[in-house]
């Protein structure tokens, strides 16, 4: 059987990559069976025009991984439906990508709900974090000079107080660390949940008009009387043409997350995201897409309260 099949490869570059690229180009020219096109940093699109029992996709995948490294991610296009299942098994960290998107997402929300143009530099951001892992540490340090104040709400006070002291001594910027369930979030208008569970977040008294961005994949619950905005996820524009082939099978955030490494270099990944020209298309709340009416109502509240 002859059919067109695309394979998208993303992974770390190693010493054998150049040799493998040359091999692909050679095959392309001599046999017109495999074509290679570079579509990003360490990202290549392989087009296989003829497959038989001696040249299966599984064998091709193993061969490419052997030459480029085991950490590559392989994404199959939707021309062959059964291949979607293989792609679904790949390790893609949606939560990490949500965190990488925070600067983009906060700028988008500011534009949508603030009556007058404002920047992150004027905002007080509250991060809910129970674990001081390398990922959360990099995020907090990134925002230190990007916002007015960084506030940490955590159950692990000792760990974060050490970070508080370090930031104060080394950068001259002091963060606030607290765990008062009644007071810590009751005046916060910008809340970013890094790793609290829905049950843990429910134990805190939250400003009824807060904007909450949830970076976990667990669905948050809307408490009675809450009139703010809960961003559970979002859709994006600006990803590669190969990802567009898979739009019908996967969410845009999943497709975009597949283009980022599982290991976190937060500042570098934020820079990469901006260079790709990614834009927020829709905000998704706990009950589906957040419409313009909800955003407009929130803008009116902020204007009337002068927040």
What are these language model-derived features?
Residues 5-20, 27-85, 110, 285-307:
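Metallocofactor- and cofactor-centric catalytic cores in central/energy metabolism, strongly enriched
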Residues 115-182:
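Glycine-rich phosphate/diphosphate-binding loop of Rossmann-like nucleotide-binding domains
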Residues 80-86, 134-136, 157-164, 199-201, ...:
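Short, charged/polar "capping" segments at the starts of alpha-helices
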Residues 28-36, 51-58, 164-185, 196-202:
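A short, well-structured beta->alpha microelement
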Residues 91-110:
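A glycine-rich, Thr/Ser-enriched phosphate-binding loop motif common to dinucleotide/cofactor-binding enzymes
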Residues 16, 211-307:
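Adenosine-phosphate binding glycine-rich loop
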Residues 173-242:
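Rossmann-like adenosine-cofactor binding region
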């Amino acid at each position: 059987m002859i059919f067109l099949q695309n394979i998208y490869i993303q992974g770390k570059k190693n010493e054998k990559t150049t040799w493998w690229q040359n091999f692909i180009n050679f095959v392309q020219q001599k046999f017109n069976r495999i074509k290679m096109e570079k579509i990003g940093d360490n990202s290549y699109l392989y087009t296989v025009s003829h497959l038989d029992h001696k040249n299966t996709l599984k064998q091709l995948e193993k061969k490419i991984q052997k030459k480029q490294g085991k950490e590559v991610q392989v994404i199959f296009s939707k021309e062959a439906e059964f291949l979607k299942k293989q792609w679904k098994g790949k390790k893609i960290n949606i939560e990490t990508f949500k965190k990488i998107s925070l600067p983009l997402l906060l700028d988008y929300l500011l534009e949508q709900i603030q009556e007058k143009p404002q920047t992150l530099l004027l905002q007080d951001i509250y991060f809910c974090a129970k674990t001081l892992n390398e990922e959360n540490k990099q995020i907090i340090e990134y925002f230190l000079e990007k916002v007015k104040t960084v506030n940490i709400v955590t159950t692990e006070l000792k760990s974060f107080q050490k970070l508080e002291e370090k930031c104060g001594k080394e950068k001259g910027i002091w963060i606030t660390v607290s765990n008062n369930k009644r007071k810590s979030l009751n005046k916060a208008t910008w809340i970013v949940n890094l790793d609290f569970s829905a049950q843990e977040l429910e134990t805190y008294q939250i400003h009824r008009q807060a904007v909450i961005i949830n970076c976990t994949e667990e669905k948050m619950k809307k408490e009675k009387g809450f009139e703010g905005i809960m961003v559970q996820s979002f859709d994006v524009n600006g990803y590669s043409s190969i990802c567009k082939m898979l739009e019908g099978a996967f969410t845009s955030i999943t497709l975009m997350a597949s283009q980022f490494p599982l290991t976190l270099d937060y500042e570098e990944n934020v820079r990469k995201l901006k260079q790709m020209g990614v834009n927020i298309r829709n905000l998704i709340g706990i009950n589906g897409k957040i419409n313009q009416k909800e955003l407009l109502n929130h803008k009116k509240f902020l204007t009337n309260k002068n927040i």
